[in-house]
């Protein structure tokens, strides 16, 4: 039996953009949304769902997509820059060590309330 009140979405690149789009349009349907290096869809400035993004070191998001430091505090959002991890390292092109680092960050966010 699925706990439909605790759904979590996660996506990489365009999948991350779609995750943020879903969080914008249907915030009541998910508890958390995780993006890995999306670039175009603005992260909604909201307390629900909880939002988290891991950022590669080689591409910047478009202007206004990521929250400011003040917005991160206000809305309990997290933006984590991964030094030495590129956009394509976040998928099958990454090393085991890079994937372990990504998984550690994601697991930590998933256990936060």
Regions found by a protein language model. Name each.
Residues 1-8:
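Gly/Ser-rich "nucleophile elbow"/oxyanion-hole loop immediately N-terminal to the catalytic nucleophile
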Residues 11-15, 19:
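Gly/Ala-rich beta-loop-alpha elbow adjacent to hydrolase catalytic centers
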Residues 21-31:
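Conserved hydrolase catalytic core segment
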Residues 25, 72-74, 112:
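Alpha-helix C-cap/termination motif
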Residues 32-92:
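The feature captures the conserved acid-bearing segment of alpha/beta-hydrolase catalytic domains
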Residues 94-113:
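Catalytic active-site module of serine/aspartate enzymes centered on a nucleophile-bearing elbow/loop
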């Amino acid at each position: 039996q699925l706990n439909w009140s605790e759904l979590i979405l996660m996506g990489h690149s365009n999948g991350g953009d779609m995750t943020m789009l879903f969080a914008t349009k249907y915030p009541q349907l998910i508890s958390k949304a995780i993006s890995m290096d999306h670039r175009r869809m603005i992260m909604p400035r909201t307390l629900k769902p909880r939002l988290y993004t891991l950022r590669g070191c080689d591409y910047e998001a478009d202007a206004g997509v990521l929250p400011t430091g003040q917005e991160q505090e206000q809305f309990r959002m997290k933006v984590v820059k991964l030094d030495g991890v590129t956009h394509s390292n976040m998928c099958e092109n990454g090393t085991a060590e890079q994937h372990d680092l990504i998984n550690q960050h994601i697991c930590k966010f998933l256990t936060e309330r």
